[in-house]
Amino acid sequence: RETLEHLIQKHHLEKQVRLLGYRNDVQDVLQSADCFAFPSKREGLGIAAIEALACEVPVIASDNRGSREYMCHTENGIVCQADKVADFMDAICRMRQSGQLRREMGERGRRTAERFSIEATDKIMRRVYQEISVTQERKR
């Protein structure tokens, strides 16, 4: 945290960047954001990024196995290489400069996140279990 605070001060970003720590009001915080930066080098599914998409917040994510499941470059956010900090900075600046871009990507992001909702996941799992059940009955 100290390193981040130092960088924020060094680049005079105190008005633009806040380190919030643990919060109970994540949805409210996300909905007030211009974008959600998710620079993980390795990630499973990336629930935090999907939560941001569900709140219509465009995501700037690193290209990894997990983000490929939900990120579509320039559709619901921007995909960058994890080790290219300048690309992340450019993407963040691009998001801050265009409200229209944020709104368009945010709307498409919400639709993306719907694929990962509890209801959608439940439907898929029920179908899988049904297929397994039918397959097992045929083997008997």
Predicted region positions:
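Short hydrophobic beta-strand element within catalytic cores of glycosyltransferases
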Residues: 58-61, 71
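C-terminal alpha-helical cap of glycosyltransferases
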Residues: 118-140
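Nucleotide-activated donor-binding/catalytic signature segment of Leloir-type glycosyltransferases, i.e.
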Residues: 3-21
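Aromatic "clamp/platform" in nucleotide-sugar-dependent glycosyltransferases that forms part
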Residues: 22, 41
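Short glycine/serine-rich donor-binding loops of glycosyltransferases
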Residues: 46-49, 67
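A short, well-ordered alpha-helix in the C-terminal region of glycosyltransferases
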Residues: 87, 94, 101-115, 124-127
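Conserved acidic donor-binding segment of nucleotide-sugar-dependent glycosyltransferases
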Residues: 73-74, 78-85, 94-99
